[in-house]
């Protein structure tokens, strides 16, 4: 016991933060998803977790922090080390370098320091605004407080965080550049007082979340007090497992329950008990042994004239209530020596007892029994809002029909209460605003200011659910499932079973078995392939919000594939009669085989030999007359060369005689490409080259454009290039540069003239062909001079009209007036003629437009038909390509 006591009071030394590993095994601090970075990150997380729980495990004598008290701390550590901690206010991820504040009341949620400061100021400002707008009836109002956004725990105004402290609150601005210390932690022992007020401090390293239960050893008694044992301070309340044996409230029986916490249950021992008056006997539980029957007492009182009017009771009935000092009902007149069986007379005065309203007295004469329940005296009353005054009976409340138009404390809805006294009740509507998580709406009563953050925490867990962490609602979309160190619980279905290498918990299908199949064939060999047996049903894929349909879908196992036929090589004899008859074959192939030699027997066609591999012969003979009946039949097409030679194969099967003449149609276009000729192959190939050229001519104009001019070749369809393109004899209209003079020249002269001017006739555009070859004469010059003089006069006249001053036009106006008199006036007939001409022009224009539209539509239809015909000809030419 001395050693135990010493253990209970031992002080634990401080644990230093874990040292980084050597340079041989560097651990990356990046967020990469690669395999090495993920393993290093997981390894570092394990080191941090082990270092935080090191002192606690030393004291707790456990190999892993698996107690229920540490589950919440492990969840905080998993989310913090994986970078999944998000601020509930701004829903942004909390980085290692961000100043933070954590609630120390109940939820231990982590927020950005700036966000919680802003949140606290908004809460206090809102309360101050409410206090200003609300009529203050209580001069001693409580001090304004602000609440934690998650657990709504209250904090005083002085508790607004001003500094960035670690989780345990000992160090200001904890280091953020040490990857071997938990973010926002000082790395030292927490030493915060534990919640059960045991007097001990937390032994974990500075950590998020609540402190674990006290692991120190203390002497403690069980619930019933019968057993004393040494227990952990955090779990010192225990049950010894024996019967409680504590005396119950009846002070007769003992508790028969197993050693338990709290008060003992009521005594349930049954027996026959009498009621309080002793007239009735009933079987009751011991805890209900004192009871009253429904009969009246009816015992004679001490006066001998009245009976007891009380119900069932214990003890004496007491004195007669009518004895002693007697008075009238209102209590103003007293009667001495009046017997208890004589009724006291009425005094005849006013009752004057205070009525239920508390202001007026009973106006009736002295009477027996209670006074009026309602005061009917008419008084002048004001309604609650003070707008209406009216004379009403005293017992009646006065309320007007006016609805309060003040805005409630939510600043969104009006009060709308009838006859409000100014103290408007809080808004009863639901806020209903969309929260920042974008998934839920605010369910709080309607309020001012920002809504509280969404209180729902989303659990991100591995496939087995053993490893998990919680994130605020709205931040789960970017989260990945944690890496679980537990082994996969899915049982393999292949024949190897437990011989497989175990793998860790995962989503989706299990990795395939890597062992060899080794299943034995009937021949005695074993399958050497990778395991291809059945695979167990896979876990569902990681989905944040699976639908009900997804949850009810049951994954099915994947059936395995059968082993292939035995691939082992063995020696088998040949079924033919060639040398080297044995051949190495697959064991599973039980059929007869042929060797690599061909049969070689001549076929009936006389052109080919049997191409079968070595096969069993019905008749063996080396002579050509006695051919084997088991050899193949020649189904090949004729492969002889035709005479005369052509590219078309003989359509007949292989035959010994000569091939028939080739009747295949051969498509050949004419020289100018205007039409296509079809010839029989035998007819076309027997002609000479000169006759072929002659037969291909279409006997029509060439229709090919000459290279040096815009005219077509006038020759009959001919092969090769068009002859003498520079000797074109077509007439061309030749003009001067001003297009005044024109003449007709022969095309070859026009080409020569263009060459003389230094331009190539091939490069001259069609609309400029022959323009500028004639020299301009005197008429062209005179016309040019006349046009220039007219243009000059017109310009001078316009300039003079612009320069005429506006003030010196009186005389000119007279001249213009005189000029205007010389102009003849138009008659009605002339106006009618002009109008008729205009109408006729409009009618002609409309008719022309209609004609153009009609014939244009017809032309488009004709063009479409022509293009279809051309397309059909092209398709036919593709079917029969030119040779």
From Swiss-Prot:
Keyword Iron: no
Pathway(s) per entry: Protein modification; protein ubiquitination
EC number(s) stated in the UniProt entry for this protein: 2.3.2.-
Topology term for the membrane: Single-pass membrane protein
PROSITE patterns xref list: 2FE2S_FER_1, ZF_PHD_1
Tissue expression summary: Constitutively expressed in mesophyll and guard cells.
RING-type ZnF: 87-152
Disruption phenotype: No obvious morphological alterations. Enhanced growth and survival under water or salt stress. Enhanced H(2)O(2) production. Elevated abscisic acid levels and reduced stomatal aperture.
Induction, per UniProt: Circadian-regulation with a peak of expression at or before dawn. Not regulated by biotic and abiotic stresses, by light and nutrient conditions or upon treatment with elicitors, chemicals, abscisic acid or phytohormones.
Transmembrane feature ranges: 841-863
Ranges annotated as biased composition (Polar residues): 1-10
Role this protein plays: Probable transcriptional regulator. May mediate E2- or E3-dependent ubiquitination. Required to gate light sensitivity during the night. Regulates the speed of the clock by acting in the feedback loop between CCA1, LHY and APRR1/TOC1. Promotes the expression of CCA1 at night but not by days. This activational effect is enhanced by interaction with ADO1/ZTL. Association with ADO1/ZTL is not leading to the degradation of NFXL2. Confers sensitivity to osmotic stress such as high salinity. Prevents H(2)O(2) production and abscisic acid accumulation.
Record note on quaternary structure: Interacts with ADO1/ZTL.
PANTHER family given in the database record: NF-X1-TYPE ZINC FINGER PROTEIN NFXL1, NUCLEAR TRANSCRIPTION FACTOR, X-BOX BINDING 1 NFX1
Entry's free-text remark on domains: The RING-type zinc finger domain interacts with an ubiquitin-conjugating enzyme (E2) and facilitates ubiquitination.
This protein's name: NF-X1-type zinc finger protein NFXL2
